[in-house]
Amino acid sequence: MRCPSCQHHGTRVLDSRPVDEGRSIRRRRECEQCHYRFTTFEKVEEMPLIVVKKQGMREEFSRDKILRGLIKACEKRPVALEELEKITQDIERELRNQGVAEVKSETIGEMVMERLSKVDEVAYVRFASVYRQFKDLNVFIEELKELIKKEQR
């Protein structure tokens, strides 16, 4: 690591500690030549994950967008914010572990619905009604019947 003060290449690490929930490492360094002390941050460079929308448009993956949708679906429901954050984190981790550069928005929606159905059925129905854009009451009733079948298994 080059010293920002004298440009010497030799530095030593005085202290290292994880930050940002373990996603980064903060290092305190000292130049071997001029003894200037400085801090560096090291983190894994994640490749951008692109979401392909229904109309073919592409946008960068946003975990906040998933979390906002979950919060809206769980409004006035007994679901802790921590649970919704965990769902969001699990979905992002699963998508990144697939090692693909692009993912369809439908895939993400299905992942959200699968997890939400295990947490709160009312929130699941709310999310599904917006996500699937039910055309009429019969389609909505069919979705409810499927949910009841799953619950009885």
Swiss-Prot record:
Its cofactor is Zn(2+). Residues 49-139 form the ATP-cone domain. InterPro entries: ATP-cone_dom, NrdR-like_N, RNR_NrdR-like. Disulfide bonds: none annotated. It comes from the Bacteria. PROSITE patterns: ATP_CONE. One of its GO terms (biological process) is negative regulation of DNA-templated transcription. A zinc finger (unnamed) spans 3-34. Keywords: ATP-binding, DNA-binding, Metal-binding, Nucleotide-binding, Repressor, Transcription, Transcription regulation, Zinc, Zinc-finger. Binds 1 zinc ion. GO terms for molecular function: ATP binding; DNA binding; zinc ion binding. Belongs to the NrdR family. NCBIfam families: transcriptional regulator NrdR (TIGR00244). Negatively regulates transcription of bacterial ribonucleotide reductase nrd genes and operons by binding to NrdR-boxes. This is Transcriptional repressor NrdR. The lineage of its organism: Bacteria, Bacillati, Bacillota, Bacilli, Bacillales.
